[in-house]
């Protein structure tokens, strides 16, 4: 598969182990649309992960399913993968799991050399509301799962809850607080339990039993405040709430009809996007509501904001059957699940009746299984293989190779951290015996001399790699280059003694080439007086000479804590000269800069020179193309 050069949200290898879910959670659209459930053969999963990790170079992999814990072969597959990949320093993560199926066998296969967090989804704080949801989870099972997690070293657990469910009362909302308090108290003998809560607002989804129910935004805000007040005295709990405005838009779009197509386009054109990001919330909400009003759908939107559909009220008045007969915009779509069955299941929900999982118990007659869509496929679990003793990645340092490399073209647009990840994955794919650091989070022993600013090409950079076994330098260069883009070119390689000081201690100077262009008709920076006449070669030469002859070049910036500071940069300026212009570059001036670099990596950047030259010339300047042409080391 394709491996991106930049960090993505789910930056790991992902392999599907089970498609479909028959748990029957009544709010869950994927669980209704993907029936029946079908397990993947365990050996196929193992082969896909093993080959995928070797071909991609990822250090993490995830086994994907709507309910991973219902894949009965998970313990056997997990142990076998840990055994086969023990020497590769990789970690296994799983999505949100069924806490009632979380046991020691699953806890032992999670993580690896690194341990990720655990996420469970009780959904509701009382047994009655969990039965309405058809969660199939008891308080005892929740406590047992949390205690198992703590016994295996997990003292921080993430829990998902939902408010606004059909039939919910204030007692159910406060039950979330009681559940968290009870878990902390009953696990106190195992240590301090830290809980991260995500409180989502229920939004109905088509093709689910809860598609006929909604809650007003006013009621959501009241219930959120009720929770905030009740959780405030508790320690060790962090809580995130979903923006009510986002939930209202999600409800409207999720249950809309074909009239929404122009609304979606108009909202996007008005600036909607990344709607769930807090910095985008105000802009996105304004874009969506404006697009809805412009389409003449504001009345429908406000009706949903006020809780236009309430299955609980219809159930209380005995009108639920007629209420569920109303036509819906998606009735013409056949998901495989009968609409009549969804209405019946809504009635069962409001009566707090539970429907068992048909993958492991009797058929619930939802209408899916048959000759067209098939039946549930549940593969009996193979025996769990004996786990091999844990093996730390090779940390011996036998040899060190120093590479000169160039980073050009589109790769100049990836960050320094992304460059390090790119190199690490290329090393893993190459199969070279790289040496890892020790400790809780082992990493390949690689060092890049000096980070390149984003957007800057580097024509002669330095990279040190330590290996756990002898490696021929040229063979290592060829194998590593085969796993890299041509835009990250390994120019040369040489063996250096392990006792050689690190690259950061050996850098003496950096050579830059950059272009500057005057910006006419702009106010000049203070204190120089404005001068919009042409910047002649003589004025350029005089400006460069003035900087080289200056005794002080102060630079104001901020430290890591955001406090203003002033640095003296004159000692870093070694040389500055004009490059004879090429044809066609009439307005641009190309400069060569040599700047000293100290042991902490402090130096000059072309942007510093742009600022000072603007002041000397009395003319605003724009920085053009920038290259770092060479890093000079002590040995160069």
Task: Please name every model-derived segment.
Residues 395-398, 413-414, 419-421, 526-636:
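Core RNA-modification/binding signature centered on pseudouridine synthases
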Residues 204-206, 434-467:
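Short, charge-patterned binding micro-sites
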């Amino acid at each position: 598969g394709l491996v991106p050069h930049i960090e993505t949200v789910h930056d790991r290898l992902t392999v599907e182990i089970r498609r479909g879910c028959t748990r029957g959670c009544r709010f869950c659209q994927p669980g209704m649309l993907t029936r029946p459930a079908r397990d993947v053969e365990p050996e196929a999963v193992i082969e896909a992960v093993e080959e995928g990790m070797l071909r991609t170079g990822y250090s993490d992999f995830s086994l994907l399913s709507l309910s991973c814990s219902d894949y009965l072969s998970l313990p056997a597959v997990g142990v076998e993968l840990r055994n086969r990949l023990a020497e590769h320093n990789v970690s296994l993560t799983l999505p949100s799991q069924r806490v009632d199926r979380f046991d020691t066998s699953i806890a032992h296969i999670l993580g690896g050399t690194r341990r990720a967090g655990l996420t469970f989804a009780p959904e509701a704080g009382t047994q009655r509301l969990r039965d309405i949801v058809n969660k199939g989870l008891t308080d005892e099972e929740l406590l047992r799962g949390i205690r198992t997690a703590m016994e295996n070293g997990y003292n921080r657990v993430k829990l998902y809850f939902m408010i606004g469910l059909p039939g919910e009362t204030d007692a159910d909302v406060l039950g979330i607080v009681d559940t968290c308090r009870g878990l902390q108290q009953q696990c106190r003998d195992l240590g301090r339990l830290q809980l991260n809560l995500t409180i989502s607002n229920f939004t109905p989804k088509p093709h689910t039993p809860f598609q006929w129910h909604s809650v007003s935004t006013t009621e959501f805000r009241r219930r959120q405040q009720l929770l905030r007040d009740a959780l405030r005295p508790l320690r060790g709990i962090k809580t995130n709430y979903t923006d009510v405005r986002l939930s209202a838009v999600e409800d409207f779009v999720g249950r809309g009809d074909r009239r929404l197509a122009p609304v979606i386009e108009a909202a996007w054109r008005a600036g909607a996007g990344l709607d769930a990001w807090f910095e985008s919330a105000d802009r996105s909400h304004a874009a969506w509501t404006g697009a809805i009003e412009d389409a003449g759908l504001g009345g429908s939107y406000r009706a949903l904001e006020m809780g236009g559909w309430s299955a609980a009220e219809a159930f209380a008045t005995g009108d639920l059957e007629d209420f569920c007969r109303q036509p819906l915009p998606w009735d013409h779509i056949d998901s495989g699940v009968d609409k009549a069955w969804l209405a019946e299941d809504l009635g069962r929900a409001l009566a707090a009746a539970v429907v068992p999982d048909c993958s492991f118990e009797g058929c619930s007659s939802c209408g899916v299984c048959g000759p067209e869509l098939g039946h549930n496929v549940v593969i009996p679990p193979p025996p769990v293989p004996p786990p091999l003793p844990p093996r730390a990645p090779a940390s011996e340092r036998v040899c060190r190779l120093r590479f000169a490399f160039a980073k050009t073209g589109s790769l100049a647009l990836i960050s320094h951290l992304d460059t390090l990840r790119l190199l690490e994955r290329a090393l893993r794919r190459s199969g070279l015996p790289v040496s890892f650091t020790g400790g809780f989070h082992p990493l390949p022993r690689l060092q890049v001399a000096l980070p390149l600013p984003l957007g800057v090409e580097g024509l002669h950079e330095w990279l040190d790699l330590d290996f756990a076994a002898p490696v021929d330098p040229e063979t290592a260069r060829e194998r590593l280059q085969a796993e890299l883009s041509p835009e990250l070119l390994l120019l040369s390689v040489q063996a250096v003694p392990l006792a050689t000081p690190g690259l950061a201690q050996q850098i003496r100077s950096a050579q830059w080439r950059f272009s500057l262009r005057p910006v006419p008709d702009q106010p000049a920076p203070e204190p120089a007086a404005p001068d919009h006449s042409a910047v002649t070669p003589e004025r350029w030469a005089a400006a460069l000479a003035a900087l080289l002859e200056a005794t002080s070049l102060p630079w104001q910036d901020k430290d890591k804590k955001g406090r203003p500071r002033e640095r003296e940069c004159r000692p870093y300026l070694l040389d500055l000269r004009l490059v004879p212009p090429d044809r066609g570059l009439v307005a641009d001036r190309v400069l060569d800069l040599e700047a000293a670099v100290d042991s902490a990596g402090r130096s000059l950047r072309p942007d510093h020179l742009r600022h000072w030259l603007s002041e000397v010339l009395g003319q605003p300047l724009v920085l053009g193309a920038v290259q770092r042409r060479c890093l000079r080391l002590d040995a160069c």
